[in-house]
């Protein structure tokens, strides 16, 4: 029976470990997906296989065992990414979990002492399987009492420290006149936002979990007003901090006008973001209502890539520093359509400032608080595989988040191209569908997305006519496939996607968008066009890829106005 696993030999090393850092047994069975090595620093106890790991983000160890036909085998041991219920346990007390194999049962445990995950105290019976005999952990007499007193003392010290820090922070805020703390710093200083007396609310155009978006007027200009309730002040501060970064102005990023406080009529006053209003609505709304020709589709795709490349770029310009920014919530609801039918990226509530090489020390971003903060993301449908299975590279998290954005960008490019009439022999695209809607429906669960995108490595379907409608039979397919590759390191950068789309939009240095791609041969499946696609970059190392969507009306005239939308 697998009990102690021969790993208690690691315990003497605990005396050499910092008392502020939990040390756990580390083990991963061959073939296990999703390594937890990045959650701590490896500690070798000797030349043999047993290893320890010193936790970086929690004080909690875990263990996973697989019980099959009465035989237990260890699957994983290591550090958890955060302290959670169960971590206060002194010993590893396994809890049964479901297993895809009916003849097997997984047991997991969490505990909060050094090397507590080296063995389990017992495995409770599951179904008709026999459980191993109880094994009492070898504990020093009086150990639990001593540990309880130690934990109580640590709790009192932390409580006193928190009270002192809160008082000092409150005093500092008063001295500074209510200055706003850094986003995510945990500060709760009250601040006096300006009252926007000239702001007029007209109608609600979108409601979300953290805010309500209104159409309104400010000093005679039509604007979008993102109104946050008092409980969502942290979300307000985080989004405002990104919009107020110097050098963030760009045609394809939603324009920030001002921030303040106020409210419509009798409703309580709260923090507000005032943004430019985009009457044509979101990309999702637009694609649902209209089809587009080749030139309009390229305009939307290229402007979207330009906006994301700008967000990701770290640069100095005119004496102003702009850090790299990961969006983390790209979706067709969070992209808005401008009057010229180009795109503007909005909803920066989850955006994260990235560490940079040229960053002034005063502008260095606050390190996210552990993996949970880094892995936080927006709309599940557009989440990259490494976010769905939580294998994102936490050592180089800035680059990893940019690669996850490019995956989301690929799904948006697929949605745009799915409504391009020139990519269909009959010029009649099907009704608009979101990415993966054809495979999983309109409201897929995280488990369904994981099974399709991670386990099966499926992506939205790319119709064969897309290859035939362009003179390069591989151009669009390559672009999309290189953006949503299962290997994050193999994906294009946003700048590279921009270059590839620019070559499609301006073939041979043309000054305007092409009206349509070269026509499709009669038999698209057997006779793809063989000519060299003039839109394909001839000297770029970048690659590209795309997929399918819905339909109804033909392209709208530029002056046509549809229901007002704004990102939230």
Swiss-Prot record:
<keyword id="KW-0723">Serine/threonine-protein kinase</keyword>
<feature type="active site" description="Proton acceptor">
    <location>
        <position position="329"/>
    </location>
</feature>
<dbReference type="GO" id="GO:0008584">
    <property type="term" value="P:male gonad development"/>
</dbReference>
<feature type="disulfide bond">
    <location>
        <begin position="55"/>
        <end position="79"/>
    </location>
</feature>
<dbReference type="InterPro" id="IPR045860">
    <property type="entry name" value="Snake_toxin-like_sf"/>
</dbReference>
<feature type="binding site">
    <location>
        <position position="226"/>
    </location>
    <ligand>
        <name>ATP</name>
    </ligand>
</feature>
<keyword id="KW-0464">Manganese</keyword>
<dbReference type="GO" id="GO:0005886">
    <property type="term" value="C:plasma membrane"/>
</dbReference>
<feature type="transmembrane region" description="Helical">
    <location>
        <begin position="148"/>
        <end position="168"/>
    </location>
</feature>
<dbReference type="InterPro" id="IPR000719">
    <property type="entry name" value="Prot_kinase_dom"/>
</dbReference>
<dbReference type="GO" id="GO:0042562">
    <property type="term" value="F:hormone binding"/>
</dbReference>
<dbReference type="GO" id="GO:0007179">
    <property type="term" value="P:transforming growth factor beta receptor signaling pathway"/>
</dbReference>
<feature type="disulfide bond">
    <location>
        <begin position="92"/>
        <end position="109"/>
    </location>
</feature>
<keyword id="KW-0418">Kinase</keyword>
<dbReference type="InterPro" id="IPR001245">
    <property type="entry name" value="Ser-Thr/Tyr_kinase_cat_dom"/>
</dbReference>
<dbReference type="GO" id="GO:0007548">
    <property type="term" value="P:sex differentiation"/>
</dbReference>
<dbReference type="GO" id="GO:0046872">
    <property type="term" value="F:metal ion binding"/>
</dbReference>
<feature type="topological domain" description="Extracellular">
    <location>
        <begin position="16"/>
        <end position="147"/>
    </location>
</feature>
<keyword id="KW-0479">Metal-binding</keyword>
<keyword id="KW-0732">Signal</keyword>
<dbReference type="Pfam" id="PF07714">
    <property type="entry name" value="PK_Tyr_Ser-Thr"/>
</dbReference>
<dbReference type="GO" id="GO:0042803">
    <property type="term" value="F:protein homodimerization activity"/>
</dbReference>
<keyword id="KW-0675">Receptor</keyword>
<keyword id="KW-0460">Magnesium</keyword>
<keyword id="KW-0067">ATP-binding</keyword>
<dbReference type="GO" id="GO:0005524">
    <property type="term" value="F:ATP binding"/>
</dbReference>
<dbReference type="InterPro" id="IPR011009">
    <property type="entry name" value="Kinase-like_dom_sf"/>
</dbReference>
<dbReference type="GO" id="GO:0008585">
    <property type="term" value="P:female gonad development"/>
</dbReference>
<dbReference type="GO" id="GO:0005026">
    <property type="term" value="F:transforming growth factor beta receptor activity, type II"/>
</dbReference>
<dbReference type="InterPro" id="IPR015771">
    <property type="entry name" value="Anti-muellerian_hrmn_rcpt_II"/>
</dbReference>
<dbReference type="GO" id="GO:0005024">
    <property type="term" value="F:transforming growth factor beta receptor activity"/>
</dbReference>
<dbReference type="GO" id="GO:1990272">
    <property type="term" value="F:anti-Mullerian hormone receptor activity"/>
</dbReference>
<keyword id="KW-1133">Transmembrane helix</keyword>
<feature type="signal peptide">
    <location>
        <begin position="1"/>
        <end position="15"/>
    </location>
</feature>
<dbReference type="InterPro" id="IPR000333">
    <property type="entry name" value="TGFB_receptor"/>
</dbReference>
<comment type="similarity">
    <text>Belongs to the protein kinase superfamily. TKL Ser/Thr protein kinase family. TGFB receptor subfamily.</text>
</comment>
<feature type="glycosylation site" description="N-linked (GlcNAc...) asparagine">
    <location>
        <position position="66"/>
    </location>
</feature>
<protein>
    <recommendedName>
        <fullName>Anti-Muellerian hormone type-2 receptor</fullName>
        <ecNumber>2.7.11.30</ecNumber>
    </recommendedName>
</protein>
<keyword id="KW-0325">Glycoprotein</keyword>
<feature type="domain" description="Protein kinase">
    <location>
        <begin position="199"/>
        <end position="504"/>
    </location>
</feature>
<keyword id="KW-0547">Nucleotide-binding</keyword>
<feature type="topological domain" description="Cytoplasmic">
    <location>
        <begin position="169"/>
        <end position="568"/>
    </location>
</feature>
């Amino acid at each position: 029976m697998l009990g102690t696993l021969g790993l208690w030999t690691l315990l003497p090393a605990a005396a050499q470990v910092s008392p502020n850092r939990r040390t756990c047994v580390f083990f991963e069975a061959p073939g296990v997906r999703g390594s937890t090595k990045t959650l701590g620093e490896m500690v070798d106890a000797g030349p043999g296989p047993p290893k320890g790991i010193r936790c970086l983000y929690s004080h909690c160890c875990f263990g996973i065992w697989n019980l099959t036909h009465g035989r237990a085998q260890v699957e994983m041991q290591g550090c958890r990414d955060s302290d959670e219920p169960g971590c206060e346990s002194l010993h590893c007390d396994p809890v049964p979990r479901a297993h895809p194999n009916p003849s097997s049962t997984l047991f997991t445990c969490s505990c909060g002492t050094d090397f507590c995950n080296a063995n389990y105290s017992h495995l409770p019976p599951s179904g008709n399987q026999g459980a191993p005999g109880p094994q009492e952990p070898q504990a020093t007499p009086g150990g639990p009492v001593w540990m309880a007193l130690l934990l109580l003392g640590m709790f009192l010290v932390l409580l006193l420290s928190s009270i002192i820090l809160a008082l000092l922070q409150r005093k500092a805020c008063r001295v500074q006149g209510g200055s706003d703390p850094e986003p995510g710093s945990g500060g709760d200083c009250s601040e006096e936002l300006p009252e926007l007396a000239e702001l007029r609310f007209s109608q609600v155009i979108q409601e979300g979990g953290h805010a309500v978006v209104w159409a309104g007027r400010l000093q005679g200009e039509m604007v979008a007003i993102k109104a946050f309730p008092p409980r969502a002040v942290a979300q307000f501060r985080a989004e405002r901090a990104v919009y107020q970064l110097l050098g963030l102005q760009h045609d394809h990023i939603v324009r920030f006008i001002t921030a303040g406080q106020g409210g419509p009529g009798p409703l309580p006053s709260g923090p507000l973001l005032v943004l430019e209003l985009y009457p044509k609505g979101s990309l999702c709304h637009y694609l649902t209502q209209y089809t587009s020709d080749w030139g309009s589709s390229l305009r939307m795709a290229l402007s979207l890539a330009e906006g994301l490349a700008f967000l990701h770029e770290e640069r100095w310009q005119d004496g102003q520093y702009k850090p790299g920014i990961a969006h983390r919530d790209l979706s067709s609801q969070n992209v808005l359509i401008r009057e010229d039918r180009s795109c503007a990226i909005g909803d920066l509530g989850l955006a994260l400032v990235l560490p940079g090489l040229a960053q002034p020390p005063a502008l260095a971003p606050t390190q996210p608080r552990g993996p949970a903060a880094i892995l936080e993301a927006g709309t599940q449908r557009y989440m990259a595989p490494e976010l769905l299975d939580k294998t994102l590279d936490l050592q180089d998290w800035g680059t990893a988040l940019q690669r996850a954005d490019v995956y989301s960008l690929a799904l948006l490019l697929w949605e745009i191209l799915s409504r391009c009439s020139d990519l269909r022999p009959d010029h009649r695209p099907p009704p608009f569908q979101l990415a993966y809607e054809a495979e999983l429906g309109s409201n897929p669960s995280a488990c369904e997305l994981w099974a399709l995108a991670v386990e099966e490595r499926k992506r939205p379907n790319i119709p064969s006519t897309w290859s035939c409608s362009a003179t390069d039979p591989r151009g669009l397919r390559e672009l999309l496939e290189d953006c949503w590759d299962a290997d994050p390191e193999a994906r294009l950068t946003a700048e590279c996607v921009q270059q590839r789309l620019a070559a499609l939009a301006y073939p041979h240095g043309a000054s305007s968008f092409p009206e349509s791609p070269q026509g499709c041969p009669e038999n698209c499946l057997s006779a793809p066009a063989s000519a060299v696609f003039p839109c394909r970059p001839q000297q770029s190392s970048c690659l590209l890829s795309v997929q399918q969507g819905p339909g109804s009306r033909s392209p709208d005239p530029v002056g046509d106005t549809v229901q007002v939308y704004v990102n939230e």
